[in-house]
């Protein structure tokens, strides 16, 4: 008798959670595509660099890094939304699980002349949500190809991101970047 009541309560609860509740939730919150576009304010925020430190034979040297994401595919957002983003990727779209192509110019204070201090990097990065679908914490792995004054090579990178990806800590390893194999970056990113 008690067993049949438990089964009945369980079936009613299952019916409510799987059929009635999701329909109510969907009706209250319709899914819409984001209405964001590049603007002057967005461009100004993109000019804020992220600080980084480069290992060298003289110790740590200071540098700064920017990043442009021309293409991103997100696999962690609502399936009713387009997973593709161009130039602008909302923090949740990126941190909830995505793959991006990126271009990253960097200023490294390891040469004597200003024109010789620029490193250009292009690559692919995957983001993996770790906590609260990536809003609280996520991680990334990437591989990139760089050019520094005619010296080319491959880099590998790992990162941890907090606060929907606004604050991140990245470590980049470039085996062929002689005497400066490691770069540590505090990444500041807004969109």
Positions of PLM-derived features:
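A generic beta-sheet turn/junction motif
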Residues: 57, 132, 160-164
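Gram-negative (and chloroplast) outer-membrane scaffold detector with strong preference
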Residues: 63-145
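Cleavable N-terminal export/targeting peptides
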Residues: 1-37
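Residue-level detector of intrinsically disordered/flexible regions characterized by low predicted structural confidence
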Residues: 4-7, 127, 158, 189
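Predominantly the C-terminal beta-signal and adjacent terminal strand-loop region
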Residues: 42-50, 153-191
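Solvent-exposed loop/turn segments connecting transmembrane beta-strands
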Residues: 52-64, 107-121, 144-155, 172-183
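Short glycine/proline- and aromatic-enriched beta-strand/turn motifs that initiate or cap beta-hairpins
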Residues: 22-86, 191
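Flexible, solvent-exposed coil segments and beta strand-coil junctions
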Residues: 42-45, 99-102, 134-140, 149, ...
């Amino acid at each position: 008798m008690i067993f049949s009541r438990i089964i009945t309560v369980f079936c009613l609860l299952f019916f409510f959670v799987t059929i009635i509740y999701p329909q109510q939730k969907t009706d209250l919150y319709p899914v819409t595509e984001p209405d964001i576009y590049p603007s002057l304010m967005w461009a100004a925020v993109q000019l804020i660099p992220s600080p980084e430190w480069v290992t060298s034979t003289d110790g740590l040297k200071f540098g700064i890094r920017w990043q442009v994401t021309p293409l991103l595919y997100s696999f962690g957002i609502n399936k009713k939304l387009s997973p593709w983003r161009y130039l602008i990727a909302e923090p949740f779209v990126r941190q909830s699980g995505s793959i991006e192509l990126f271009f990253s110019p960097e200023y490294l204070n390891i040469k004597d002349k200003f024109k010789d201090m620029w490193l250009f990097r292009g690559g692919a990065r995957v983001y993996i949500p770790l906590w609260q679908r990536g809003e609280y914490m996520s991680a990334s792995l990437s591989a990139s190809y760089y050019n520094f004054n005619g010296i080319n090579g491959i880099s590998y990178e790992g990162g941890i991101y907090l606060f929907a990806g606004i604050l991140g800590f990245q470590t980049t390893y470039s085996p062929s970047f002689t005497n400066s194999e490691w770069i540590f970056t505090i990444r500041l990113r807004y969109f």
